[in-house]
Amino acid sequence: VRRLGEVRNGRRQLGAISLDKFIILVTAERSARVKEPTGRIVLRGASPSTRLQPPDLMQFTIGAVREAESHDMQHMHVTLAPSDSARWTTVPMPANLQMLPAEMTLRPAVAPYLPRGDSSLPRARPRELIRLTNGDTLRLRAGLVHRAFKGQTLTMFAFNDQYPGPLLHVPQGAEITVELTNALDQPTTIHWQGVRLDNRFDGTPDLTQQPMPPGGRFIYHLRFPDAGIYWYHPHVREDVQQELGLYGNMLVRSPRADYFSPAHREEILMLDDLLVNDDGLVPFGADAATHALMGRFGNVLLVNGEPRYSLLVKSGEVVRLYFTNVSNTRTFNLSFPGARMKIVAGDVGNFEREEWVESIVIAPAERYVVHVKFDRAGDVALPNRVQALDHLYGRFYYERDTLGIVHVEAARADGNLEASFAR
């Protein structure tokens, strides 16, 4: 019990309460000097988190479940061909979480799906930078690839056999043409996240265009009126197509030299997670998505499609980092402990005033741009630190995952940017 003080007329500021759950009691006492409250409780208040309660254990023990609810929560309902080799298994669980045995036996009510491919499929390769100018044409192909991942060979999707898809650099105001060929076994489109464009080319199936069938082709005409960081991905069965690798970044350059404060270099990072087990990818639902509302969390965190990101910088270097969260449902909370960081831009472009921050919270589809200065030699981690939730016991717990390491050399960076960075 923590005493907060005497209640008087007017408003009393308590300050931050750093507790996961709390209840506030106001009691009527004979004197404000009492050490232990004994009077009648006249007011009771509680944090919203106190409403978090464990489920009815008896319900799960006997294996009772509700009927399957509607899965039509994605942009387009597409039934995929079930995979002969795919099977439902127990989903990997974090080491510090438990599920009841009856709950662990539950399986989705739809057939499992995984993409199928033979040995002739190309190997996925890292993304390439494509610099486009006004009037250029970009040709993209959505197809299947083989990908080496943590000692396994996975069949996944890719634009132009690249994972992530090609990184596009475009000058502000440019107009380009994109020809998309669908080499998948299912319909698809491309949505250009955040770009103000002609509605006909927004990529929303059955609203702004008809989805491209397998073997089909569609031509997008795009104009980029705003500088900033954007990304592209399908709007058909995102739970499958985006999760399997159909995404890429677009960096639209401003003609202004002072659009951002100075930095020594830029890094463009796409954040994702992937759900895998000992057999490879955990299957998706063939008839419908198997995860709704909270979505499908992965158990391996990725930066630019790979676990354990690594970057080599010099002491004193200022790095401009463009972050894009392409995961289905995970919100990231990123920081660089021991390095100074300020946020300079977001989804809609640069900020009028840069702000110092300890971390940045990035929800799915969001983008942020930060400047980080690495002052001292050594290793700086890039952790994701969140307050996670144990639904079984109704409790919060701390979770920390390291996405990568920045290795800072003792050699000093050319050009001291401390004056402009410190403003």
What are the functions of these language-model segments?
Residues R2-D72:
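N-terminal targeting/export leaders
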Residues N9-S18, I219-L222, V369-V372:
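Exposed aromatic-hydrophobic patches
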Residues D20-I24, I176, G228-Y230, V319, ...:
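Exposed beta-strand face motif in extracellular beta-rich ectodomains
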Residues E69-R139, Q242-V276, E352-R423:
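Extended terminal and domain-junction accessory segments
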Residues E128-L129, P164-H169, P307-L312:
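Short beta-strand segments of immunoglobulin-like
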Residues T137-V252, R330-V361, V380-Y397:
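Histidine- and aromatic-enriched segments that form or immediately flank copper-ligand environments
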Residues F149-Y163, D279-F297:
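Short, polar loop/linker segments at the starts of domains and inter-domain junctions
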Residues R200-P213, A286-A422:
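Histidine- and aromatic-rich segments of cupredoxin/plastocyanin-like copper-binding domains
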